[in-house]
């Protein structure tokens, strides 16, 4: 089984071909292809290549499946003894992708 570790949106993801993944929002239309050049590691069976910091010539190709927003995260700011409470919420945008190929 081949897999790779990519960097996008300031996070690292372990990906394999055919896998669906929710990443930080990309400004790419649904159905289009996107290429990730920042590949930190590529493994194909027992053959593992680790980059310093990235693997030269390696790329991961994916197709954008959908754009959306995660569930709401609610927070409460509370000041004791002051009769003050503030409720807030946040919904982060995401891009769902399907990994179509790993090239090393």
From Swiss-Prot:
Gene Ontology, cellular component aspect: cytoplasm; ribonucleoprotein complex; ribosome
Pfam family, one: Ribosomal_L21p
PROSITE patterns recorded: RIBOSOMAL_L21
Keyword RNA-binding on entry: yes
UniProt GO BP: translation
Entry annotated with the keyword Ribonucleoprotein: yes
Classification via SUPFAM superfamilies: L21p-like (SSF141091)
Entry-linked InterPro entries: bL21-like, bL21-like_sf, Ribosomal_bL21, Ribosomal_bL21_CS
Keywords, alphabetical: Ribonucleoprotein, Ribosomal protein, RNA-binding, rRNA-binding
Coiled coil: none
GO molecular function: rRNA binding; structural constituent of ribosome
Subunit structure: Part of the 50S ribosomal subunit. Contacts protein L20.
Record-linked PANTHER family: 50S RIBOSOMAL PROTEIN L21 (PTHR21349), LARGE RIBOSOMAL SUBUNIT PROTEIN BL21M (PTHR21349:SF0)
Homology family: Belongs to the bacterial ribosomal protein bL21 family.
Role of this protein: This protein binds to 23S rRNA in the presence of protein L20.
Protein name: Large ribosomal subunit protein bL21
């Amino acid at each position: 089984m081949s897999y790779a570790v990519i960097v996008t949106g300031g996070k690292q993801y372990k990906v394999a071909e055919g896998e669906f993944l929710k990443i930080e929002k990309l400004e790419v239309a649904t159905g289009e292809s996107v290429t990730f050049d920042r590949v930190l590691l590529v493994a194909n069976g027992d053959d593992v290549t680790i980059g310093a910091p990235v693997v030269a010539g390696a790329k991961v190709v994916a197709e954008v499946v959908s754009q959306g927003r995660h569930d709401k995260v609610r927070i409460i700011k509370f000041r004791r003894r002051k009769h003050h409470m503030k409720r807030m919420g946040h919904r982060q945008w995401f891009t769902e992708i399907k990994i179509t190929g790993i090239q090393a």
